[in-house]
Structure formats: structure tokens, C-alpha cells
Amino acid sequence: MAMTPVVEPANAGIETLTSPQRFADAALIRRWHELLSASPNLDRTFQSPEWFEHARANPGARPLDAAVIVRRGRGGAVDAIVPLVKDYDALAFVAGPRTLHTFKLKSAMVLGSQFMGAEDEASYDELLGAVDQWASDCACITLPSVPDESFMRRWAETSRAVKQRFIMYAPFDPGTGKIFCTDFPATFDLYNSGLDKKRRDNFKRKVRVLDKQGKPGKLRRFESAGEVPEFLRVARGIAGKSWQSGIGVDPFPRDVDWQAKLSDQAERGLFRDYILECGGEPAAFGVGVVAEGIFHYRATGFDSSMSALSPGTVLTYLIFGDLLGGAQPLQKMSFGFGDTPYKRLFCNRDFAASRVMLLRKTPANELLWRSHAAFRTLVTRAKELYLRYRPSEDKAQKPAPAAGTPPESSE
């Protein structure tokens, strides 16, 4: 009697890893890094195994539930990886400087914002099914920073698998919209030669001004866990004298255990922070994360009393030199979300990007989505009407910078 052939299920090649022992498998880690090295994703730093371990450890708080979705091809080789953690996302109802209310949603966070694998709809639909199953207790799946022109964004908007189970929503978040970055050449000399003459001369002049003022600039790099306490002490001192402090913005919020957080990053080779000293005095700081050939500039600040010396510009310029001066020069630098003059000064590329939320199709989520979208439309329309009909004396006044945005005159 002939046996009936077994039909292989669609997700036969998919495996959801949830144990630390499986995460640490040497063969998986090697293949993980191979896939990362071929990825064009600017946020591949946050797809790395090192960042995944840092994210799930959640230093200073409770560890997060985590998983790695792995897909194997016909030959058994891993051809797609999706690292995930469960955390809380939020939809905030923001009008100008005021946050009226914030709804928190349990979410499966896709680290690096994109699936790491072949870019085709069937493949992504298959991976989504595995993510959906693991995140069945979550209200949504979050892609924190998706380029508008990426395959991931087009798939999220058009996939039938997404439309059947989720509401795709890209909420407007104040301070987002564009990401600025720099694609590095092989050396710092090549970077300088690629600048237009005006910018090149301007950078070098600002460095010389420090020498002429008797305050020569010195860049200090911090990489090890043992250096974290000193970095935090010096950086917090600078932050207290920064323009951000004047508007109530703290780059090191007290509800975060920065000692634990940065020390854990350092132990995983992710921590790369800087202090600029001018004549021996702390003048500016830069907070960064480095992995997979990319440096992410996550926060910066300078002592406002030294603004005439352009410490922020000098700091960033010297950081570029350091990133390109080592035995393994980095390939890219990301300044993240936000359109500010200093980013335009240093970056050679920008692109539109958004946070994308895949909200489960539930009555509560649909009500929240419709309410938030309608509120955002109302706020946008009100702003347009105000700008059109505001009194003439208001038009003559320059608007104050948004929180997190350095004044144009600061550098």
C-alpha cells in the first residue's frame, strides 16, 4: 500500500529560540555575524548578538523576555534571523510642548527595525507568522526606525499577511522624520579631502582657535567598564551647564541606572563615549554605541559658557578622526532621528524614516489608532491655521527650538 506523502508545513524551516543556551550557540553566532556583514541596514548594530544580549539583560531593571527567530533554507543553513524582545511601546497624544496622555502597549520589539534575510514578500510573511506566534500576548509589533523607501516599509504597507492580522500605523513622533548619517571613506585624510573647501577650512579653524585661546582641545575616549563612573561624573557635570539643562532636558535621566547600562555595554564591546577637554577643562561630551562597523551618536552636549569656542563642533570633528584612525576604521556614523544644523554640517546622507507599529486587530487597538490619527490631524491643522493667521508681531519672533534641538547659533 502506497504511503500518502506528508505535506511539509509552510513554516517548517522556522525555529523560535528562547533559551540562553541556544542564543549562545557558536555556529549560530558565526552565521549571525555573516548575515550582518552583508546587511545594508544602518541599524544593524541593534541586530547584533551583542546588542541583543544587552537588550534582553535590560541592565538596572528586570530582564526582558527575548527570542531569536531563525529560518533555515533547504540545505539547513540559516538564511534569516530576527532578534526580538518584549517591552512597552507607547502612543502619546502630544500638542506642542505638552503631552496630554500616553497609552502604553506591550510590544514585541524587532531589534534593528528590519528582518534580516532575503527581501521577498513570502519570506517576510513567513517570518511575521513566527513573530506573531511568539508575541501572542503583545498588543503590537514595533519596528522602531524604518526607512520610508525600504523593502520593510513597503512590505508592511502592502502585505496581505499584515493586513489580515494587523493595523499598520506610522505615528508622527516629534523630533523624528529624518535620519542623518555619514558614509566614511577609508581614512580621515580622505574624509577631509572630500569636504568642500569652506567646511574643511572651518573645521580646522575651530580646532586652531582653541590653541590660540590657550585652551588646546584634547579628546578622551572611554571604552571599558572601569571608565564608566568617571565618564558619567564628567559628562553629567557638562550636562548641568548645557543649553539642554536650561529647558529641562536631561541626557542622563535619573530613572535609568546608567552605571549598570553603560557598564554592560562596555563588557559587550558596544560602549564608545567621548569627552572633549579645552585647556584641561571638560567642555563637551558624546555618548555612542559601536558595533558592526557603525557608530551611533546617541547624545551630546557642551558647556554653554564655552560656546564661543564651538566645543560641540570640535568634539564631533575629533570623534570622526578617532573613528577613522584605528586599526579597524568604521564604515558609517548615524546621528539618528532629528534635523538640526550640526548634523547637516557633518553628514553626507539623509533619508526619511518612521516608527512603524503593527497593531493587532482588536476593538481597543482600532479605537486607539483612529483616535490618535484623528488627534494628530487636528493638531497639524491647528498649527497650519496658526501659522497662516498668527499676529504679525509673532511672525517676527523666531520660534524656540524643540526639545533636544541645539540652537543654530550655538556652534
Predicted regions and their residues:
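Active-site/acyl-donor-binding loops of N-acyltransferases
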Residues: 2-10, 156-189, 327, 331-398, ...
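A conserved beta-strand-loop-helix scaffold within acyl/acetyltransferase catalytic domains
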Residues: 14-100, 146-157, 170-308, 408-411
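Intrinsic-disorder-associated interaction segments
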Residues: 21, 25, 120, 196-199, ...
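Short, surface-exposed linear patches
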Residues: 41, 92-93, 102-106, 163-167, ...
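Noncatalytic linker/hinge segments flanking ATPase motor cores
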Residues: 60-61, 107-114, 123-125, 182-188, ...
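Acyl-donor binding region in acyl/amide transferases
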Residues: 88-170, 174, 292-350
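Short secondary-structure junction motifs
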Residues: 138, 214-216, 271, 330, ...
